[in-house]
Amino acid sequence: MRTLLTILTVGSLAAHAPEDPSDLLQHVKFQSSNFENILTWDSGPEGTPDTVYSIEYKTYGERDWVAKKGCQRITRKSCNLTVETGNLTELYYARVTAVSAGGRSATKMTDRFSSLQHTTLKPPDVTCISKVRSIQMIVHPTPTPIRAGDGHRLTLEDIFHDLFYHLELQVNRTYQMHLGGKQREYEFFGLTPDTEFLGTIMICVPTWAKESAPYMCRVKTLPDRTWTYSFSGAFLFSMGFLVAVLCYLSYRYVTKPPAPPNSLNVQRVLTFQPLRFIQEHVLIPVFDLSGPSSLAQPVQYSQIRVSGPREPAGAPQRHSLSEITYLGQPDISILQPSNVPPPQILSPLSYAPNAAPEVGPPSYAPQVTPEAQFPFYAPQAISKVQPSSYAPQATPDSWPPSYGVCMEGSGKDSPTGTLSSPKHLRPKGQLQKEPPAGSCMLGGLSLQEVTSLAMEESQEAKSLHQPLGICTDRTSDPNVLHSGEEGTPQYLKGQLPLLSSVQIEGHPMSLPLQPPSRPCSPSDQGPSPWGLLESLVCPKDEAKSPAPETSDLEQPTELDSLFRGLALTVQWES
């Protein structure tokens, strides 16, 4: 009987004994990282997939448990209690109840939990920037789910006031550099270009003895491309300079005026060369002032040949007629018509050329020339006098200038002529007016006499048009010319401006005066104003003048007296 009662008692006690929770539920605990609190657990050996779990929590010191909404009869094995355990100064408890499909249940509670103490720190968020010789590391702030009283989320720096960062940089695990501090930006200097480094960054909280997991980054410094940049800059500068030069050359080529055609090149077409002195021929006008003042007075010309600068032996022959030089006197008239009826006897002014040097100054300076003789005069000894400078004088009521041309033709072989009237020849030193206006005589009146007479009568003269006369050896006027000496130049009627230039050809020679044997009629159209030649051109090979006459010799003067009287300017070209 006693044995039966013992079996019944043990069976009833076994039926009322609690189940072991380790068979259905185990490892219930809080896992907190950066103050994110997660409750986790594992199922026991007898747990099945259809086992459900329910979670409850309470603050330390309270008796009642609070069921967690959203974590009742769940099959997952975790529940987030961050909000329910967000107070950093409180301690919390949590428990899990597991119920199997067979009706078995098990409950297990966590240990006391403090977020400040039990939370762990995650690795920081860092940005590594590689440079040529340095590596820069920027630590970003780590946010937490904890909210402040105003609702904004706190960071680790806000929660742990003694938090600081520890940085380490190493190369091949041999060379290490360390930096630390509370700032968020760090940079390692003095690194080798094009080298790989391993960086490690950790968060340290000394008060709670916490260290975060290290953040690791592999960074390679940049290669040194300074020479590449220098070369590129030099290349770009060279290309820019080349483009600028090409643009400038293109602009110059486009804006350059086109070259004139050869047909417009006058220097190739013309054969004469201006301002080149060769042998000089001068026509000295002789006036007859005895005629009525209302008629223009005829002009006769005495030809003078003056030798130019000597050329060295063997020098090439210069161009004869085409190479000329003009000595201008455009504004000063030498002779003007006069109404003074009585003839005036002027003291003769002699012309004395002297030897001249080869080259003269640009403006006229009288030079010493070889001795010369006037026509119709006996040779005389020439006195050497210092040349005087020429100063042109302007006269009132100046006439328009005129000129004369002596041209070479076939007149050397033509019959010579004589003056149509004997009054063409007169004693030296006498100047008479001739009534006829159509005759032109060559006589013994020197150029200085004519100049003196013109200067005295300049106040009484009227402004009249000057007649132009042309002296030529090519043709002759049968109405004007008569037979005379052979080789004398012939004179054609025409109108020329005043004498303003002298042509000098190459060979030096004496200065005899050659009287023309044929009269020159200025015009056939009635009275015309008389004037003085201003320009003269003669060839160098003109026939030499006959021997000068011996009667009534004039006292010779210097060459500068002639040009001073005529107000001419002589320019020499080397």
From Swiss-Prot:
Principal location listed in the UniProt entry: membrane
Pfam families in UniProt: Tissue_fac
Modifications the protein undergoes after translation, according to the UniProt entry: Ubiquitinated.
GO molecular function: cytokine receptor activity; interferon receptor activity; interleukin-20 binding; interleukin-22 receptor activity
Signal peptide: 1-15
A GO BP entry: defense response to Gram-negative bacterium
Expression sites (tissue/organ): Expressed in colon, liver, lung, pancreas and kidney. No expression in immune cells such as monocytes, T-cells, and NK-cells. Expressed in keratinocytes of normal skin as well as in psoriatic skin lesion. Detected in normal blood brain barrier endothelial cells as well as in multiple sclerosis lesions; Strongly expressed on central nervous system vessels within infiltrated multiple sclerosis lesions. Overexpressed in synovial fluid cells from rheumatoid arthritis and spondyloarthropathy patients.
Other remarks on this protein: Failure of medical and surgical therapy in Chronic rhinosinusitis with nasal polyps is associated with decreased expression of IL22RA1.
Biological role stated in the UniProt entry: Component of the receptor for IL20, IL22 and IL24. Component of IL22 receptor formed by IL22RA1 and IL10RB enabling IL22 signaling via JAK/STAT pathways. IL22 also induces activation of MAPK1/MAPK3 and Akt kinases pathways. Component of one of the receptor for IL20 and IL24 formed by IL22RA1 and IL20RB also signaling through STATs activation. Mediates IL24 antiangiogenic activity as well as IL24 inhibitory effect on endothelial cell tube formation and differentiation.
Keywords, comma-separated and alphabetical: Cell membrane, Disulfide bond, Glycoprotein, Membrane, Phosphoprotein, Receptor, Repeat, Signal, Transmembrane, Transmembrane helix, Ubl conjugation
Outcome of substituting residue 58 to A: Strongly reduced response to IL22
Glycosylation sites: 80, 172
Membrane topology: Single-pass type I membrane protein
Subunit structure, interactors included: Heterodimer with IL10RB and with IL20RB. IL22 binding to heterodimer is greater than binding to IL22RA1 alone. Interacts with FBXW12; the interaction promotes ubiquitination of IL22RA1.
Alphabetical list of Gene3D superfamilies matching this protein: Immunoglobulins (2.60.40.10)
Residues annotated with Phosphoserine modification: 410, 414
Cytoplasmic topological intervals: 250-574
Entries under InterPro entries matching the protein: FN3_dom (IPR003961), FN3_sf (IPR036116), Ig-like_fold (IPR013783), Type-II_Cytokine-TF_Rcpt (IPR050650)
Domain Fibronectin type-III: 17-124, 141-221
Family of this protein: Belongs to the type II cytokine receptor family.
Disulphide bonds in the chain: 71-79, 128-217
Protein name: Interleukin-22 receptor subunit alpha-1
Region of interest (Disordered), residue spans: 388-440, 454-489, 507-560
Transmembrane regions listed in the UniProt entry: 229-249
Membrane side Extracellular: residue ranges: 16-228
GO CC, alphabetical: plasma membrane
